[in-house]
């Protein structure tokens, strides 16, 4: 790993064992991009990679020079209105109404380590020798403002992180109308864009489409990263698949409004931009003030989509997630929501806890309905004091009774919301994130609190901190069950309104930081009606997230497959729920439900008191299996083998770091009849190591399992083999593979 600056050619070469990123200060003193991709052998001069020539009708930067036009030059952080007609990385408005600025290279710093981003989540290092950072300082002296481009390259990962800081040192105020986290200009357009799209209960489905001229974008203007689009995109060569080919991955460490887009110009170059969505964003800076953008993480892979994903997984699991629970195995839980919804009292809860303890579970989570007068979704959000009548005593007493059964105690909260039927709203109607006197949209009969306001955060924070200090809570599920609509901060001026959406999410981060710092032993799980805020920003504070409110095992195949494009198994919340399923009404075997849920944090969300002895015995087996395998599942290398978006079958596997153990999950949705013989080719094993595969009466070397594959044929397909139980539709099987 190194960052080398050549003063003569004014080039920066950022490289490690796998990647290179080369920047050049151009003739106009602005930074241009020469190369990003597979590692290049370092040399002193790469300036021949910079190409420019006359193009008819282009605007040219220098008098008497008809060759240098920003319209067809690859740039690091392109501005608005200076000859580049593509979408800019930032736009500034001056007091005189001008949007024309010219930031040029002033100086730079190269140092070991990685700086923290004030008030924002970001990847980190545990020692300075893990990474090097370049701070590239640009200045427009005419407006007394600097832009600092931050680049960090890791030693152990094919990763570069980027963010931008604006610093104003002028008596003139400037207003940021747009401030993206990074821009990447690529030489050609021969890529396919991959993104993760969906809606409630159908999150992060994989989409892949060829780049074309113009702009293709994904975004959120909902106040959270959203179900609709995850803050991630990848550009893959057309021949790239899960196992081979060139892939660029881009992920934004942010939980609010975002924009991620590709733009192909008529010279066939592709531009990637990612950052805070400019719609509704307007940030004014006065003298001595600064603005920091969120971090964008860039991953390069020569080993296809699995290679990209494995880098994201390890980076996010070990250098984004933090705290006590980063490396600890996660407890097997029972959640009360789909067991009782709002219809519970203390005897019901204690009965469920008895059943959970008897089956070997470790954590009891009391979901919605324990506070205020909360017997349905119409009241009491914001009134974070226990309903002692409903609980037949204090919450502390209930938690201690559950602890006495050998279970940890967890709690559901939704700090950012209120109902009109609540003590909070009656006392502070001006705390809603909406203009008083105007019609306000409701969703789930609730409303958003203005977390841009310090007094709101402190009020909610004090209530929750006092609660957690009193009650022996080991787990918190932090929910957010609606998105923004009418955004307005009461009592603040016009200039403030353009800052509200970003200040809101900074406020959420602040409260997360307060609570996780005060209670480091508590495991936090993020949630937003399922997966509406399942993003890297949340992972910085909560090492696991509720992946989707859809707990149906068959629907979860696509949801968890897509989620794994970016996020490690250790953060994917997954539960075994009731059959028929509460979202789809689908009936599936309890074995299948567990075989899907194993590949996540794992838990149960159903009424255990209604189970028969056969199901209870199966759950005991499942829990014993998970306790034995969860260290491998949480920390192993994950491979996607067969996509649910391409056929009737899904498969994935996890391999231990030493390649001595693996688990393979195989799923078939519908039972075919009289089809051909099936093989599943594995990955990540040692070719010359002999392995025992569960369900087979013979051993196989790794090369056979990877080149020929496991036999998956069953009796309904015309031949019996021991690998797969014949279950008909919704078949699943988890294979254990162990080195002999």
Language-model-derived ranges and their functions:
Residues 5, 10-13, 21, 31-263, ...:
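Polysaccharide-binding surfaces and accessory modules of carbohydrate-active proteins
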Residues 18, 164, 288, 334, ...:
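Conserved, mostly hydrophobic/aromatic
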Residues 71-117, 242-257, 299-324, 361-368, ...:
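Glycine-rich, aromatic-flanked loop segments that form ligand/cofactor-binding clefts
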Residues 100-105, 283-302, 730-737:
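Short Pro-Gly-centered flexible turn/kink motifs
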Residues 242, 644-686:
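Carbohydrate-binding surface patches
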Residues 325-461, 475:
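Aromatic-lined carbohydrate-binding/catalytic grooves of carbohydrate-active enzymes
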Residues 392-394, 426-428, 432-587, 601, ...:
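Active-site neighborhood of glycoside hydrolase catalytic domains
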Residues 670-740:
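C-terminal beta-sandwich/jelly-roll accessory domains of carbohydrate-active enzymes
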């Amino acid at each position: 790993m190194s960052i080398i600056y050549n003063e003569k050619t004014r080039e920066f070469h950022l490289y490690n064992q796998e990647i290179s990123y080369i920047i050049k200060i151009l003739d106009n003193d602005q930074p241009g991009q020469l190369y990003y991709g597979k590692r290049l052998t370092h040399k002193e001069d790469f300036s021949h990679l910079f190409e420019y020539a006359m193009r008819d009708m282009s605007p040219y930067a220098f008098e008497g020079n008809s060759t240098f036009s920003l319209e067809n030059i690859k740039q690091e952080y392109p501005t608005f209105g200076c000859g580049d007609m593509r979408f800019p990385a930032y736009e500034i408005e001056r007091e005189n109404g001008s949007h024309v600025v010219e930031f040029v290279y002033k100086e730079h710093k190269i140092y070991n380590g990685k700086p923290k981003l004030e008030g924002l989540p970001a990847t980190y290092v545990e020692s300075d020798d893990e990474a090097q950072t370049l701070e590239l300082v640009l200045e427009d002296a005419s407006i007394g403002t600097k832009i600092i481009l931050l680049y960090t390259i890791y030693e152990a990962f094919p990763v570069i992180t980027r963010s931008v800081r604006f610093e104003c040192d002028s008596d003139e105020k400037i207003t940021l109308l747009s401030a993206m986290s990074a821009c990447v200009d690529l030489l050609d357009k021969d890529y396919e864009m991959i993104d993760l799209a969906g809606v409630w209960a159908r999150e992060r489905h994989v989409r892949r489409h060829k780049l074309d001229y113009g702009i293709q974008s994904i975004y959120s203007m909902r106040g959270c990263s959203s179900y609709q689009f995850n803050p991630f995109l990848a550009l893959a060569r057309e021949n790239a698949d899960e196992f081979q080919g060139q892939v660029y991955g881009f992920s934004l460490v942010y939980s609010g409004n975002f924009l991620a887009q590709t733009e192909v110009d008529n010279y066939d170059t592709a531009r990637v931009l990612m950052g805070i969505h400019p719609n509704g964003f307007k940030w004014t800076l006065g003298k001595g003030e600064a603005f920091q953008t969120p971090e964008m993480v860039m991953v390069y892979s020569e080993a296809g989509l699995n290679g990209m994903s494995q880098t994201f997984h390890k980076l996010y699991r070990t250098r984004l997630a933090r705290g006590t629970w980063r490396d600890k195995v996660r407890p097997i839980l029972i959640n009360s929501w789909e067991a009782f919804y709002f219809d519970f009292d203390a005897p019901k809860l204690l009965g469920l806890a008895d059943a959970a303890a008897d089956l070997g579970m470790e954590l009891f989570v009391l979901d919605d309905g324990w506070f205020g007068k909360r017997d349905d979704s119409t009241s009491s959000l914001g009134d974070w004091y226990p309903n002692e009548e409903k609980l037949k005593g204090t919450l502390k007493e209930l938690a201690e009774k559950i602890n006495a059964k050998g279970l940890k105690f967890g709690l559901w909260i939704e700090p950012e919301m209120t109902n009109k039927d609540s003590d909070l709203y009656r006392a502070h109607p001006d705390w809603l994130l909406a203009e008083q006197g105007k019609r306000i949209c409701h969703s789930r009969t609730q409303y958003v609190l203005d977390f841009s306001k310090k007094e709101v955060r402190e009020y909610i924070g004090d209530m929750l901190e006092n609660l957690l200090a009193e009650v022996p809570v080991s787990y918190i599920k932090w929910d957010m069950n609606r998105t923004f609509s009418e955004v307005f901060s009461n009592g603040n001026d016009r200039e403030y309104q353009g800052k509200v959406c970003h200040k809101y999410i900074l406020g959420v981060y602040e409260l997360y930081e307060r609570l996780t710092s005060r209670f480091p032993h508590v495991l936090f799980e993020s949630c937003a009606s399922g997966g509406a805020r399942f993003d890297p920003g949340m992972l910085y504070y909560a090492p696991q997230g509720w992946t989707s409110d859809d707990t149906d095992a068959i629907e979860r195949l696509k949801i968890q497959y897509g989620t794994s494009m970016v996020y490690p198994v250790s953060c994917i919340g997954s539960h075994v729920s009731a059959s028929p399923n509460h979202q789809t009404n689908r009936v599936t075997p309890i074995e299948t439900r567990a075989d899907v849920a194993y590949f996540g944090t794992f838990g149960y969300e159903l009424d255990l008191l209604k189970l028969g002895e056969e199901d209870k015995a199966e759950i005991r087996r499942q829990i014993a299996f998970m306790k034995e395998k969860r260290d491998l599942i949480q920390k192993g290398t994950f491979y996607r083998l067969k996509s649910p978006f391409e056929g009737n079958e899904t498969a994935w596997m996890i391999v231990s770091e030493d390649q001595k153990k693996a688990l393979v999950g195989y799923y078939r949705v519908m039972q075919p009849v009289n089809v051909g013989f099936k093989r599943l080719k594995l990955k990540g094993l040692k070719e010359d190591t002999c392995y025992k595969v569960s369900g087979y009466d013979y051993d196989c070397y790794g090369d056979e399992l990877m080149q020929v594959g496991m036999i998956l044929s069953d009796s309904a397909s015309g031949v019996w083999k021991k690998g797969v139980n014949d279950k008909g539709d919704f078949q699943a099987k988890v294979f254990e593979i162990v080195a002999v």
